[in-house]
Amino acid sequence: MIRLAAIVLVAFALAGCGSDRSTDNGAAPTTTSTSPPSMQTVPDCMAPPDASTSTKKSSANENRETMYLTSISDGSDKCSAKVLFGFEERAPGPGYEVSYRPAATAKVEDGSGNPVEIDGQAFLVVKLTPAMTAKIDGDQVMKTYTGPNRLPGTGPIAEVVKTGDFEGVVTWVIGFDREHPFTTDWSDSQLVVKIDYS
């Protein structure tokens, strides 16, 4: 009987040694987890560093050779709206001046000064010089641009309207919902006016 009692006591002692020590003080075991690294959102579209709403973009035609407008097209993509002014294939292209102007001076016809209706709240005026939309030879007039004088817009552009073809200056106005940064570039006989979404 004494030997049996001793065996039972040893069994209880071993059971006590095998218990979880982490619960000896009554505290629950602590678990830690590592949160996944946060994802930084990078915008799909960013305006180029030279884009601006306040800076006038201009280029002079040093040869003073008249350039003839042949087309206006839309080259927009998901990040920007583009208005392409196409000319006959001649270098270096017309002189141009592109800048935002108040409605009082933007929405008028060159020469006559008559008001021109243009949709939008901000107006980017594109002046091309020396440039024309037709070749004149005596009584003969051959139009090089036969498209519309008013084109529907896309994205932030409300519409594009011709406001002048007078004394070697061709003027178009791009109406916007507000002023957007823009850049200009001459490429492949086209003046590209690029308006970035921002």
In which residue ranges do the predicted regions lie?
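Hydrophobic helical h-region of N-terminal Sec-dependent signal peptides
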Residues: 6-11
